[in-house]
Amino acid sequence: MATPRSAKKAARKSGSKSAKCGLIFPVGRVGGMMRRGQYARRIGASGAVYLAAVLEYLTAELLELSVKAAAQSGKKRCRLNPRTVMLAARHDDDIGTLLKNVTLSHSGVVPSVSKAVAKKKGGKKGRATPSA
């Protein structure tokens, strides 16, 4: 005969914390890293779930922006590389401020022309006007 305690255990769903929360990022691993990092004396169970959800959202947002940037490059095949990820992150206002001090390896620099170089001079040179 099953006791109430064993019946509850049998009724419980088995599976990872990520699957129970509907996340892709590993909640258990994030919680372990939070505990090992000693950011606080005590870490609640919902803290790891919340942090994993935030990381998953930011990753999905950056991936979506990167795919759009790679598709706009005009090439036939769309391939993500560190350069397209960096360009997408720098051109977005929110993610750009969040990743302002981050260096992505093998991504190069954001192309920009300084104002001093972009200034045009007053007269047009090179055109000869006919003096008839």
UniProtKB/Swiss-Prot annotation:
Pfam families reported for this sequence: Histone, Histone_H2A_C
Signal peptide: none
Keywords: Chromosome, DNA-binding, Nucleosome core, Nucleus
UniProt xrefs under InterPro entries: Histone-fold, Histone_H2A, Histone_H2A/H2B/H3, Histone_H2A_C, Histone_H2A_CS
Annotated compartments: Nucleus; Chromosome
Recorded GO MF terms: DNA binding; protein heterodimerization activity; structural constituent of chromatin
Major subcellular location class: nucleus
Assembly mode: The nucleosome is a histone octamer containing two molecules each of H2A, H2B, H3 and H4 assembled in one H3-H4 heterotetramer and two H2A-H2B heterodimers. The octamer wraps approximately 147 bp of DNA.
Function: Core component of nucleosome. Nucleosomes wrap and compact DNA into chromatin, limiting DNA accessibility to the cellular machineries which require DNA as a template. Histones thereby play a central role in transcription regulation, DNA repair, DNA replication and chromosomal stability. DNA accessibility is regulated via a complex set of post-translational modifications of histones, also called histone code, and nucleosome remodeling.
Family membership: Belongs to the histone H2A family.
Protein's recorded name: Histone H2A.2
Naturally occurring in which organism (per UniProt): Leishmania infantum
